[in-house]
Amino acid sequence: EEITKEYLKQNQKIIYINENQNINGVIIFDVIKNEIELCLGTDEIKQQLIAVIKKIALKDIVYQNKIIQIKTKKQFKHYEEVYDFIHQQKDRVYSLDNFKKYMQEFYNIQHALKCIHVCGTNGKGSTVNYMKEVLKKQGYIVGTFTSPALISRLDVVRINDEWIKEQFIVDVANRYVDNWLKYEISLFEIEVFISILYFIYQGVDYAIYEVGLGGELDATNIILPMVCVNTNIGLDHMDYLGDSYESIARAKAGIIKDHVDFITGEHKQECVDIFRDTCEKRHSHLIRLDRIHDLQDGENVKYTYKDYNIVLNTPALYQIENSALALETLLYLKKHHFIELDESSIVEGLFEAKWAGRFEIISEKPLIILDGAHNREGVDELYRSARKLHNLKIIFSALRDKDTDYMIERLLDLTYDITVCEFKHPRSQSAKLLAGDYPVKIEPDFRKALDDIYLQEGTFLITGSLYFISEVRKYLLQKIHSK
């Protein structure tokens, strides 16, 4: 296995082993040359192995000096065209059935990846990022799948810190667009599929998948992980997941697989009971986060978890549990011999981790902080860290299906200087409806509200929908870099 791993890394090969009870065939495919270098087994096994490579090959392939033609189109030239085309298709039903059938046609190649699966209401992206940074420090190549996009559509799929290549998306779309239409799979399912292919092509050591919505019916639930992780349970996406903590916990418990252990940072007993029941049915172990000790608030929060003294490069208190959950997961993987893990990698990786849009200081003068607190629990956690800020002024916007009354009331506990805005999104709430009867300012154009920052003194906190934060971040960075 170690030889295979190094071979993959150094030469960018895909090695596929046909395995029943015993290994009875192997194929080696060079993804740079598009050449099958080796194929061993009986004639029947060889045909099966070649069929797998033909299915995932993006271009004509060479085998024994002969060309095997791969059918592909020239429909797309730029990755933006791919997304525009997919968005034009009809709405898809929130179900995993079609995607399961689709992946069966691809021999369930996702099972070749060593995955970690992360669900939860808040903190998923941060937890993924903390794990990725520590694994990177340990020398591993790590693929991550997170959503929604914050900086670019490309940042959903990354290897270490590099976004997926635009041309890869174009090549995959031209190769498989007819299959997408045939199975009527959704944009999110297509993104998951592209990530699976990309991680296989690039030979990642590990892939970490963040659930998009819920758990059981989410497209990421197509993977077979080494371990499943839950950050917490909050009241969000209630139209899809139900309007109680219990119903949301049941939806998220849907990622629990047979004999795959489940680690959670959730504290509410009614949710933990649901996780425990599901784990028992799945013959999986439920693992809960240990107590966190010696917490120190400040510019860099500090704490002790088990025997590790951790310092985070953020004042955001909510990142303590996210990073501790990441650490607990990595310690589990080490204990069960999935990974090697040194203390230096843990300490350095957790400290160096940064995640855009989560208590992100984007400017020092004036002090501007971005935070994607987009639901009740998110705003509660934001309050804990933001209450120490002085002369605070808030700019806020949200989607219309969120509990915006609660969110604004909580923000008013921090300051009465709040401006509500709008942003471009089909579900964006109008500034007027956001404001209601609350003592807040209304400025529909968020750009005008941001421009006004530079005419005032104080500390500025911009918060709400992650889609809003994405737009704000782009605008502010352009403004900062133009000075």
Which residues make up each language-model segment?
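Conserved beta-strand in the GNAT
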Residues: 22-31, 35-37
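Acyl-donor binding region in acyl/amide transferases
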Residues: 33-72
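Extended acidic/charged loop-beta regions that coordinate divalent cations
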Residues: 191-240, 272-309
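Short functional linear segments
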Residues: 73-120, 127-140, 145
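Active-site rim helix/loop that mediates acceptor-substrate recognition in acyltransferases
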Residues: 2-14, 18-19
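C-terminal helical cap/extension that packs against the catalytic core
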Residues: 268-278, 283-287, 297-300, 367-368, ...
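ATP-dependent carboxylate-amine ligase catalytic core
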Residues: 93-96, 100-111, 137-223, 239-241, ...
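Nucleotide phosphate-binding/pyrophosphate-handling subdomain across enzymes
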Residues: 112, 201, 206-209, 219-229, ...
